[in-house]
Amino acid sequence: MSWRDRDFDPHGGRNAFRLTDESKQSSSERAASMRAMRSFTQSIEDEGPPELPASLDIDMIEGVSMKTSDTNDTIIEVKPGKVDPQLGETQKYKMAVPGPGHSEQEQELHKSLIRDEEEDAEVEQVFAASAEPVVTPPKSLNFAETAEELRHAYDQKIRKRPTTPTSACVLDGIAFFAGSVDGSNDTIPTDAEKKIKVSIPSGRRRKTENMSYSEFYESMANQIPGGGGRRMSQSGRTTPLHDYEGDILDENPQYKDKAPPAPVVHRRSSIEWENFADMEDKMEQAEEKARKEEKKEKEETAEVAQNDDVTTEKHQNEVEKSKKMLNFLAKPPTVEITSPDAPHQGAFHDNTPKEPKVVEEEEDDDLPTFSEDMDEARQQVMKEMTESVVKTENVENEKQEDTHISEGHVEYGTEESPAVTDGSYQQDGTENAYDPNAYPGYIWNYETQEWEYDPSYVAPEEPIDQSAYEAQAAAYAEVDQRAAEVVYQREHAGYDQGDFYTHQDTSYSSEAYAHDQAKGYQDPNAYGAEAAADNSQEYDYSAYGGYEGYLAACRAYDEESQQPQYGETVATEAYSQDYGYEQQGDYHHEGVGATDENSTSAISGYEQNGASTSLGYGDAQGYDGYDHNASYYQGQEYQQEYYQNHKYENSQYQVDQHPAESAAPPRPVAPMEPLFKQAPPQPDPFGWDSSGHTGDAPTASEPVQELSPTPEASSSTGTSAPARPPPARPEAPKKDETAVDAAAPPRPPPAARPPPPRPAPANKEKPKEPEPEEDAWAQFKRMTEKVSTAVKSTESTLKNLEETSAANDIKDESYLANVGGSQGFVNESTQKEIQRLTEEKKMEKLQKKKLKQQGKKAATPTLEPDEEDAMDRAAQELAMKMASMRSDMADWKAPEMIPVKEIKKAPEIRRVDSASAIPPRKRSSIKDVQQDSGGSLELPPHLAAPQDSIAPNPKGDHAPDDPILSAPAWADFETSEPMLPPSESGFFSNKDASNEGGVSRDATDDPFVTTVASSEKRSSFVADPFAPQQAALIDESYDPFAVVAVEEVVAMAKAKAEQAAANAENEDDFYNGRQSPTLSTPTPEGGSPISQQRPNAFEDDFKCAELTGLDTPTPLYDEDDSQPLTDFIPKFDGDGWDLMVRHPIKKKSFMAERCWKPCYVRLHGLTLYLYNDKKDAQPIQELLLQATYSLSDTTLQAYDVYGKIHTVKLQFVVYKEKVGIRPGQISRLVDGHITKYGLPLEHSAQCTVLLKFGSLNASHLQTFVTTVEDLLFKCKITRTAKPVYKQDEVQIHCYDEYSAFVDKEGILSDQKARVRLFCLAFLTGSPVLEVGLNDRRRQGKEIVRRKDILPMYTERWIRFEALEFHSIVNKPEFDKEQVIAFSPPDGCFFEIMRFRVRPPRNREKAMTVKSIMKIAGSKVEIRIEAMAAAQIQRTRGSDERRNIPCEDIAIRFPIPEAWIYLFREERHWGVGSIHSKKLRPGKVKNLKDRLLGAVQASEPNLIECAIGEAKYEHVYRSLVWRIPRLPEKHHAAYKSHLLKCRFELSSFDLMPEEFLPRCDVDFTMPLATVSNTVVRSVSVEQHEDSDRVEKFVRYVAKYQYKVEIDYVQCADLDLDMADPSVNPEAAAAPVPELHQPTFNPSTQESDTQQGYRIDFNEAEMGGSNRRDDSSSDEEPDSHKMPIIQIDMKNYGY
């Protein structure tokens, strides 16, 4: 078998050098084997440095892996990915989901949407250019994915042959974290105080210059930002830094005498790669360079400590370059606090969340991935490690305490628990075989089975200055006392923000601070993780909510390092702004270093709530008000108690404490944190409060203070200052303050007793060092973080204000200045009555709540007014001081504070107003109202007056110092409900119409104290129209200088009551409207007590809506059903119809012409038969009618040169879904309602015309249309298809059809109306439609989802009669529930049901048409007046009304045939009708010309109309006036429009013996105004997504009036027939005789003359041609033009 056909063996290269039987080989043989494998690997890797893949550009690393990775990605041979048969093309990948929390969620992506790794590299590289420092909302980070993704991206490109697998890739260390080198990425390790002492191996760092990859990796390191807190787990035997050419046991004397406890089995199943030998030279050179740098660092540490200077970014980068270069291979075992949802799993762990474990189990949380045989050996080692840990705990505990204290590392807040000491791991030479994940900075050597100090391990932070690296070097050097001193120097002497306690790898142990968090240090939230977070610690990104949040905090932290030091920004700016952390009152900042299940207590301790004076740390008082370092010095129990009970006592520092008002308070020494930590409690991935900005806050929360070893410092350490009030806002440090000494202070007392904090030494004012250049995007990100935090703070503040604001009690509809709104016209007394009831309920709730609270805690002691006033002032001063110390609260104005004990009361007091102060009990009189108007529960004591002073005093006579008139009461929204100022409308002129003589109160009256009502001394107060009548307190506080006499108020009240009654009588809506008084009026009872009855003209939104349509004089239907309903359209009983059909039926070619061919149509059953002639036996075509067929609307189409023809199409319509917009969707698109596919979709109709019929007789054709519609309605159909639509849609069409006769007087008769319901549905699957109508049988019994209710004013219920249903409708369901349920056929416009209604008899006509023909001798005038009535439509829930117009109006006035020629004119193409001139009647035409006499009088127009167009239409034999719409847009209803047609008959014109009696009026209205039918709901059941179904309802009312024509003979056409008194002389003139033609047919013989008559042949009249063939020899004889004959005898129409 060819090697190409075999599966690729990633271990083939190194297996060639491996012994066959590994269990029998000695350690030397294994070492030789490994060296051979390393040599093999090096030979592969040394072929040339590859180009750095774009995916390794750390600028683009966000700490978030976009997909998981496995070993298959690392091999060279790339094969097509196998599709999981279960998942198909949709595979699950980890994706970063944007949004608060940025939690990782599994998204299902189709294969086509998944990017390849090459695509990832390019895209991410481009992205990295603009987002170098990733500062995004906090999110948990899975480091295994990050490492794997980067490693695979690199390995795939450079690996030419398989290399040996191992735990870490070369690039993993570098690419692991964005920002591991670049100083601009200011990431701070979570545990700034965590320390693990490490000693660098004796051999110097090697192979930096000589190594072939050195330049490559140096350049690569330059690109990589500082990697804060790497989470790589050391899972390999070694790293390039430990790839010694000789046996490691021989080279490292520390392990010389130690033998591995068990044989090391090579991890053959490892999925990870490492190049064993390619880094040996680099190791040597790097270690050598590192040692040199360590010396420099040590020398510079003292310098840094004295000058308090931060080393330049350049030097930082250089140091970090070298260290990171050595570091990037090693994945040191990290002790981290990982959130349960994103536990630390080493570099390449599975992404399986682990629950938080106890300290002993925390080891397994970070286990690296081992092969099976390796894992067994590892378990054995772990067992020994655990035993050794237990044995050495107590010993190390003591040693650790001494060591830490001697080094100046006082473990604050700890009680020297074993976890603290062991976790600190600062004992020299500690070599316990601990869990690989437990010791950052250590590497597990699998040859020696020992821990080796990892010289490549670098604290994951950004700009760590030289002092930081000195401490690092010291920490990694041989762990002796000197190293400890160096660490101390770095930490205490020169601790500027640049130091960051860099290499105290103490990662706050959850044992020390989190395990017993309630007792000590209260979670980093109390203070710890921020201030004490050691940048070198493995960061718990969960505390930040993610790596990005961590970066943000670190960057902010580092920026602070560039500030003139902590003292300058003191707890406000440095801590709030520069750390990217806004002191937000609502944020519970989870600490970075150690978190625990007790973090909630810490949260209370570290709640940046400026209003809480009992917070433990970082409140608005900054560091002055409270030594936040005290949490470190105190015992765990004591510290918890301190946070809860102490109120920023400054007892923690004495010497430098009080000067700290100008200088920053002391920064506590970072407590040593044990290595074993517990995972923090599960953070809310979307909670910005706990893990969102907490990440920023912890590092930012408190800048690490530099601890002075001066005697002052030590003395202050031993003593505590007395408590004093909160200090003023801290100022910048003064220049003359003492410099920081590098010497270690005297050893403080053990931490068994909480020692006082170290006062901060005076920091010299040093020149501000230039901040490291930061990418603009990073700055923007950080600023965005600040802004978002500020926004959160503002939102919380606004939320509190919203809850407590008196504006809540101002009803929007009560602003009567804007006339309108549902409450705009409510009587004042009515409004007050409503509000009184509402506020009583509110007070009941408030009292229940208060009683409930009082049951839980002791009742608040009653205080005297003076005492409470003093407490208010003191609290306000305290709040002002607290605000003054916070830079972010510079613009904050302290609210009116009350003591903390009563903080629960504040919202209630804010809400207490005239309404809410009413006790929850009913009152029967105004006396009770005034006596009990307050209850005095909520009145602030400074407003409460003595109860004994009840002497009456007229309004306006109050003394200036009256509490009622004092400033708090005048503009106090806490104790009064805001009112509008007195207005001209008189809203405030009457307190109560029923309170004509109110109880007058003295200036010192407590308005809530019951008083005796004296009727003779009652005075009416200015009324608050928004408050209930009972609240007299508020009324007195407004307009106190307006004194209104009682008589005036009573008179005004009575006048307003009468006006309200009059308005109520006069204001009747035209159509089914609600009665709304135009003004807010008092109760008509005048001075009577408040009536519990509803007063006259009562109007509110709570009125029973169903009465709206019943109390109007116009009912919705005629209730008299004694007479049976007649057929709406009489049944057709003829044999068939003489019609015309368009021939040929199917067009043969595009250019072919078709003509109208006479035919005869019969209907038998559902079959339509088409004959050439009525006498034919065989039809020329048969057509079976189906339910999917439909008839078009009847239209007019050109027929010949004289006129048009009525046509109708029998068609089959197919709908196709395509992109487009139909008229109904435009408004929805404007509102943003777009389909789920992002494009507007319409279902366009594609019509297939089966037959097209025409007729010159409109009524004849209408009978045919009606008959066919009846047949289609009875056709049966079922839903068979189950289509799939991108956009589902349901259309319901409701057609009202109405006909009536109107006589000359305008009286309606012979009304008929019916309703037809059509449906057109495009629904996926086989759903069921349920249509609910306003059937009165269904009133009050509707059960329908809210989403299915259609937005119509539907409080109208009508009676259905003569119901007919389509066969598809579930008839029993309708009989039971009155719901039309059916499964609609797909894409079929069909009629669901039809029913009859009885229109009311006295209803106003929608359009009034009056037609008159005046005949004055030979002069004739046709006069038509049209006027549209006001049809009002109102939307439910609002008072908005709009007129419903009449549209497509056609008024047809019949013209005798003898006069037709008068309306015709010859044109160049034939004969046409004379069109009307649009002239408004009553205007003088050509006035200017007439005055000048320049032009003769113009010829009179034949037809003049004010609107629309009029002309003679031969198909109707009528003068047709067409109007598009009445009333016109922006025009009012009831406006009369006139058409005049004047002509004079000649001597040849005949006068008809009789005229047609009526004219026709047709029009439509866009709502169902005839029947008032309303589709209340459309429900789609059994549908996959009924919420996405678009629903449309179209209402059309089709009216047809037969209006009687008034024929009048008069003396003059200008005579006003309606009012003859206008021109009595003309009216009295004799009426001339009727016109007589010159040739009288009655006297002439028929042979001589014949009257004018147009003869139509049989075909023209709708009959069949005499010849079937169009091409006949006798064609010249056939008359194409009608013949005009004269027949005077039988003249008629």
Swiss-Prot record:
Residues 26-39, 632-643, 708-722 have a biased composition (Low complexity). It comes from the Eukaryota. The keyword Transcription regulation does not apply. It is found in: Cytoplasm. A motif (DPF 1) lies at residues 684-686. A motif (DPF 3) lies at residues 1024-1026. Residues 596-615, 786-807, 1073-1095, 1637-1651 have a biased composition (Polar residues). GO terms for cellular component: AP-2 adaptor complex; synapse; synaptic vesicle. One of its GO terms (biological process) is regulation of endocytosis. Residues 1287-1606 form the MHD domain. SUPFAM superfamilies: Second domain of Mu2 adaptin subunit (ap50) of ap2 adaptor. Keywords: Cytoplasm, Endocytosis, Repeat. A motif (DPF 4) lies at residues 1039-1041. Residues 745-760 have a biased composition (Pro residues). The Asp-Pro-Phe (DPF) motifs, which are found in many presynatic proteins, are thought to mediate an interaction with Alpha-adaptin. Belongs to the Stoned B family. This is Putative stoned B-like protein. The lineage of its organism: Eukaryota, Metazoa, Ecdysozoa, Nematoda, Chromadorea. The gene is unc-41.
